[in-house]
């Protein structure tokens, strides 16, 4: 393995580690329980959108982690199996939360998609109208 690849991997691992450290610190100080991994994803997304971090700086390690994502779920699966007693005790409540959250998620996603598509449709109509007006001006038909 070339030295450049090793340094690239180490720099990507450092970026991910720094983001996770920051997200862990934030999670411990939040008044509501929120997983540090979710906070880390939001931080990484924000840094990528703001172009503080370039995609090339984290892409290959991110791709490698995505490739082994199934393996990364093993500890979560073991935790679920260890918690089956608690889950059985609160089965109805857990099932209710899952169903309600799924319905809310589907509704919000659908409404948001309709909003975006409606906005896109309006922009398309406005663009067509503007082209017609500009075309008329070129031919001296519109004052």
Curated annotation (Swiss-Prot):
It is a multi-pass membrane protein. This is Antiholin-like protein LrgA. Its main location: membrane. Pfam families: LrgA (PF03788). The chain crosses the membrane at residues 6-26, 30-50, 61-81, 97-117. The keyword Zinc-finger does not apply. Inhibits the expression or activity of extracellular murein hydrolases by interacting, possibly with LrgB, with the holin-like protein CidA. The LrgAB and CidA proteins may affect the proton motive force of the membrane. May be involved in programmed cell death (PCD), possibly triggering PCD in response to antibiotics and environmental stresses. InterPro entries: Antiholin-like_LrgA (IPR023736), LrgA/CidA (IPR005538). Keywords: Cell membrane, Cytolysis, Membrane, Transmembrane, Transmembrane helix. GO terms for biological process: cytolysis; killing of cells of another organism; programmed cell death. GO terms for cellular component: plasma membrane. The lineage of its organism: Bacteria, Bacillati, Bacillota, Bacilli, Bacillales. Belongs to the CidA/LrgA family. LrgA subfamily. The gene is lrgA. It is found in: Cell membrane. Signal peptide: none annotated.
């Amino acid at each position: 393995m070339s030295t450049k690849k090793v340094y690239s991997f180490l720099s990507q691992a450092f970026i991910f580690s720094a983001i996770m450290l920051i997200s862990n610190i934030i999670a411990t100080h939040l008044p509501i329980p929120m997983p540090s991994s979710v906070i880390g994803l939001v931080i990484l997304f924000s840094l990528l959108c703001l172009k503080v971090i370039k995609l090339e700086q984290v892409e290959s390690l991110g791709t490698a982690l995505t490739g082994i994502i199934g393996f990364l779920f093993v500890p979560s699966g073991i935790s679920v199996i260890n918690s089956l007693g608690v889950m059985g005790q609160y089965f109805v409540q857990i099932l209710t939360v899952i169903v309600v959250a799924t319905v809310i998620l589907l509704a919000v996603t659908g409404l948001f998609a309709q909003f975006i598509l409606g906005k896109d449709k309006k922009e398309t109509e406005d663009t067509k109208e503007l082209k017609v007006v500009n075309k008329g001006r070129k031919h001296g038909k519109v004052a």
